[in-house]
Each structure stands twice: as structure tokens, then as C-alpha cells.
Amino acid sequence: MSAANADFELFRVFLEKTCGIVLGSNKQYLVSSRLNKLMEQQGIKSLGELVQRIQTQRGGLREMVVDAMTTNETLWFRDTYPFEVLKQRVLPELIKANGGQRLRIWSAACSSGQEPYSLSMAIDEFEKTNLGQLKAGVQIVATDLSGSMLTAAKAGEYDTLAMGRGLSPERLQRYFDAKGPGRWAVKPAIRSRVEFRALNLLDSYASLGKFDMVFCRNVLIYFSAEVKRDILLRIHGTLKPGGYLFLGASEALNNLPDHYQMVQCSPGIIYRAK
């Protein structure tokens, strides 16, 4: 094995232990593209040196590396159907079952905030057409591993490029305030439903409490089968009986029939906690 390949193996082990992400052996180009600038700034010549520096030094290097490797582009109202299923099927059902209690939604691995803010907009749209049905309100808890992503998400400000990814002109006008050339901010009424917290999905979820819905979309694809199963079992522990799990369009929940019931929607699939 060449020195470069050995260094890459060291880094793969570090990343999986730190945040569960499994890198294929063909992902050296991805690691280079994400870390070259940081390594140059830090005067680090190889991935092996980077891992050694992380292990022997205190400071923010570990967080900067994890930030660089876990930051992903995201969309407003990604795949559309989960938000329609939420409004047309899940909210009416849970309101009926919950007897007027506040509903809680967890947006796991929320990145720069588009998913939780999309959820808050969908809640607002539901309220406008179902007056008085959500008297106790809805709390959205949004978590991410990346400190820089959480800072950006809390700020709730986006540029033209981000705004063009899945947001209709009507929603832009209704739910955002212009903040100068090419920048918009999520309106306070939409932001007020969302609470952002730092969380590594490998860590305990006990502090989060119980939820009526969990959105863990386009996240599990990065984990090994073993870690994925562990996360899904622990998510089940955060769901109230009859609560719903939303996964990504290309993700499936296999081999957990004692915990989740598949619910066919049109289109899409969601999962009800047993």
C-alpha cells in the first residue's frame, strides 16, 4: 500500500469513528476537494499528518475537518411530497389523536436550515387553511453536527443561489424579508417555531425528548448498515407511539418490522412507529 493510500485509510477510520460516515475507497478525490484548502491554511502536507495533528492537539481542527466533510447542499421543500403528506395526511391524523397537545418535529442533520424552515412554512400553510386546529402550536427541533452549519441556519439568511433551490416565488414573497442585494432572511414568525441544537447522530438523543414526527432524510446513506440500524432503533425511541418517520426518497427502512410499519402514500412512503 502506498503512503498516500495508507494515509487515506487512517482518515477513513478517523471519520467513521468520529461521526459514523463511511467513505468508499474511491473517495480520495472528495476528501482532497474538501480538505485541500484547510490543510494548506494549517501547513499540513498529508492526511496522515492531519489525523496525527487532530489526535495530539487541542483546538478546533477536529471540528473544522468534520465540518468540511459533513457539509452538504440542501434544498427547500426537497422532493415536495413529504411536505404535502405532512399537510394533507399526517397533521390531521395527529391533531385528532393528540387531543390538542403541542406537536413536536425533529429535523435531524438539518444542514443550513432549509428543511426545518420548509417544515415551518408548511405548518403555516396548514394553519391558514385549517383555522384553530393547531391551537397548542408546533415545535421543530433541528439538529446538526456542524457548528458552522448551525450558525448559518440560526441566522436564517440566504443568498440568491440558495433561494433558487426549490423555493417558489410565492413562498419567497410570503415568508422572507429582503436584506439587501441578493440576500433574504426568513421571517420571524417562521423562525420562531424552530430551535437549533448541536447533535452528533452517534451520541445520545435523551436530551431531545419525544416527537410526533422525525425527518431524517438523505442522511443514512452516509452510514454503515450497522450504524444505520442503530440510529433507526434510537430514533424509534424518540417517537411517540403512532409517530412518523420520514426518510429520503432513495432510502428504505429494512429489517425493523417490530418497530416501524410502512405507510404507502401517493407518492412516497413514510413509516409509523409501533
UniProtKB/Swiss-Prot annotation:
Keyword Cell membrane: no
Domain CheR-type methyltransferase: 1-274
Name of the protein in its database record: Chemotaxis protein methyltransferase 1
First-level EC class: transferase
Keyword Zinc-finger included in the entry's annotation: no
PROSITE patterns the record matches: CHER
Protein keywords: Methyltransferase, S-adenosyl-L-methionine, Transferase
Pfam families: CheR, CheR_N
